[in-house]
Amino acid sequence: LGIAQKRAYPSWAAMLEGEKALPADERAQVIMITTPNHVHAAPTIAALEGGFHVILDKPLCTSMEEARAMEAAAKSSKALFCLTHTYTGYPMIKEAKHQIASGALGAVRKIYVEYPQGWLSTFLEGENHTQAAWRTDPAKSGKVGAMGDIGTHAFNLAEYVSGEEIVEVCAQLNTVVDGRALDDDGAVLFRTASGATGVLMATQIAAGEENNVKIRVFGEKGGLCWEHT
């Protein structure tokens, strides 16, 4: 990878200590965390407390307690904290957001967002598959499976594109594949602060699907649709 041996660290804790020991003009300025979910909170808090900017892959963490501790660390640090979601950087997503924000659709009334995958249609975690193993393990993934893994993308997309804040949810989570410890399929009914309603679907047992994300938003004067095919 072209990394100097002295900066190839055995752990995130060693990395932070090693970088803090370097002169200010040589040390890392930004730490990007793309570890499994259960290794999000501790390195984020330590990095922020150490003065490093943090870019963290979604989801934020695995519990409300961790989330509050991370929020406190971010507020008390002079460093910046960023939580990333894949699709908000797409040009057409930004255009969709702009169209709605500019009033082209009128007041938002309805939001439909779906994220189907099929890679967990079988008991893949039982086949020594590294990604499947940790993503379906409650100790590493958290309390939810598909909804936490890809439902977070759909939720983020619904709020980002529409400009609405989701304030009420009613969810049904299903575990379809026998032996799986977490949900692999789910649907959510939601309501926003303005009164708009919507439906969110996230599933990883839609055989044949990869990342065919789709969002539709309807307002008083019209609607729009974006699909990742």
Task: Please place each PLM-identified region on the residue numbering.
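N-terminal Rossmann-like dinucleotide-binding module
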Residues: 1-4
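Beta-loop-alpha module in the N-terminal Rossmann-like domain of NAD(P)-dependent dehydrogenases
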Residues: 7-73
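Alpha-helical elements of Rossmann-like donor-binding domains used by nucleotide-donor carbohydrate transfer enzymes
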Residues: 14, 30, 42, 69, ...
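Hydrophobic residues in well-ordered beta-strands that form the structural core
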Residues: 33, 56, 62, 81-83, ...
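Rossmann-like NAD(P)(H) cofactor-binding subdomain of soluble oxidoreductases
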Residues: 39, 59, 82-89
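Predominantly a Rossmann-like dinucleotide-binding segment in NAD(P)-dependent oxidoreductases
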Residues: 80, 87-180
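Contiguous beta-strand/loop segments that form the cofactor/metal-binding neighborhood of enzyme cores
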Residues: 130, 149, 153-229
